[in-house]
Curated annotation (Swiss-Prot):
ANK repeat copies, ranges: 21-50, 57-86, 91-120, 124-153
Keyword S-adenosyl-L-methionine attached: no
Gene3D superfamilies in alphabetical order: Ankyrin repeat-containing domain (1.25.40.20)
SUPFAM superfamilies per UniProt: Ankyrin repeat (SSF48403)
Species in which this protein is naturally found: Homo sapiens (Human)
Gene that this sequence comes from: ANKRD10
Name by which UniProt lists this protein: Ankyrin repeat domain-containing protein 10
């Protein structure tokens, strides 16, 4: 003990123990826990002597009691008027620093309850929790943390208490302090916001059947397209089945090029097609048909999609319809049980507009005007509202053909009449 040797050198001829007993009787009583001697001395000692520092460590009697864990002596000194937050002249250390370094949690807790400042730094910028980390006292660290000690404070060398414990080899204390630091850093990140992360700005994207082009409904500020307001999206009527997860369904929404759909040769009106279409991946799918006397019918059964999304009908149950597919001659074809077409057509608009189901070029188009009108594919970017309803086009085509047959019959009759 170099400090004690220096003190003994000052008083030549005296041992450190003799010097302590003669010159600093209060300090000696606190070291040994001699409560009777301490109480007797406190009755005779002036109040100013309670703050006197020894020549060995530069401690007051309170520091001695705290370092050696003499709680009864500490209590008597404070009752006699000793100051809790008194700092030493040499290192500016309080009794809380000394108790933490000595590894005495009982004394430390009592000092805290009596009003000691546990975040006061010493001359090296260290608080009591740094001293507890140096001594490896997990009990003192826990007591300090439980009473509001700051675990993230750094000393003059830039080290936290966790760094000091790690340097001294106290792994358990270091890990405990590191966990506390991480907990403290994450304390302000709540409501699903992670450290360094962001909140989901699109909370409504979990709707399974939502079209990818329309899923960002409330994001006008981000420059994306607003959703249509005419009707509810199909996702409310399209449940997840077969245990498919949200991620699986979301993967099905990846935009792809629209496949060419089988020609709608002599098909029925689009209203029947839209009515009997089934929902796959959030879009309307229009089932393919088998040729019937050289014609293809679009009226068929709605099947469950491959990803478990159905239109609400039981599998195998044909969609009820009061009429079959109309041929050019006006006769009805019986309804058939059909299979879903794996090739989906463009489905930007699901409100019955033609761009939801127009093929590359309908095979029933004959004249040059119709060819020009349907000369391009109505897919992404087309405004369906600017295109006339397909029912009207079909009806017009049928009317023209009927008129041509009527004119042909009239001309034939006139030729026969005049020829005879």
């Amino acid at each position: 003990m170099s400090a004690a040797g220096a003190g003994a050198g000052v008083e030549a001829g005296f041992s450190s123990e003799e010097l302590l007993s003669l010159r600093f009787p209060l300090h000696r009583a606190c070291r040994d826990g001699d409560l009777a001697t301490l109480c007797s001395l406190l009755q005779q000692t002036p109040h100013a002597h309670l703050a006197s520092e020894d020549s060995f460590y530069g401690w007051t009697p309170v520091h001695w009691a705290a370092h050696f864990g003499k709680l009864e002596c500490l209590v008597q000194l404070v009752r006699a008027g000793a100051t809790l937050n008194v700092s030493t002249t040499r290192y500016a250390q309080t009794p809380a620093h000394i108790a933490a370094f000595g590894g005495h949690p009982q004394c430390l807790v009592w000092l805290i309850q009596a009003g000691a400042n546990i975040n006061k730094p010493d001359c090296e910028g260290e608080t009591p929790i740094h001293k507890a980390a140096r001594s490896g006292s997990l009990e003192c660290i826990s007591a300090l943390v439980a009473n509001g000690a700051h675990v993230d404070l750094r000393n003059a060398s830039g080290l936290t208490a966790a760094d000091i414990a790690q340097t001294q080899g106290f792994q358990e204390c270091a890990q405990f302090l590191l966990n506390l630091q991480n907990c403290h850093l994450n304390h302000f990140y709540n409501n699903g916001i992670l450290n360094g992360g962001h909140q989901n700005v699109f909370p409504n994207h979990i709707s399974v059947g939502t079209n990818r082009k329309r899923c960002l409904e409330d994001s006008e500020d981000f420059g994306v397209k607003k959703a249509r307001t005419e009707a509810q999206s199909l996702d409310s009527a399209v449940p997840l089945t077969n245990g498919d997860t949200e991620d699986d369904a979301d993967k099905m929404h990846v935009d792809r090029e629209f496949a060419v759909v089988t020609d709608m040769k002599n098909s029925s009106s689009v209203s029947n097609t839209l009515t009997n279409g089934c929902v796959i991946n959030g879009h309307l799918d229009f089932p393919s048909t088998t040729p019937l006397s050289g014609m293809e019918s679009r009226n068929g059964q709605c099947l469950t999609g491959t990803n478990g999304i159905s239109s609400g009908l039981a599998p195998g149950q044909p969609f009820p319809s009061s009429q079959g597919s109309l041929c050019i001659s006006g006769t009805e074809e019986p309804e058939k049980t059909l299979r879903a077409n794996p090739e989906l057509c463009g489905s930007l608009h699901l409100n019955g507009s033609p761009s939801s189901c127009i093929a590359s070029r309908p095979s029933w188009v004959e004249d040059i005007g119709d060819n020009l009108y349907y000369g391009h594919y109505h897919g992404f970017g087309d405004t369906a509202e600017s295109i006339p309803e397909l029912n009207s086009v079909v009806e017009h085509s049928k009317s023209v053909k009927v008129q041509e047959r009527y004119d042909s019959a009239v001309l034939g009759t006139m030729h026969l009449h005049h020829g005879s």
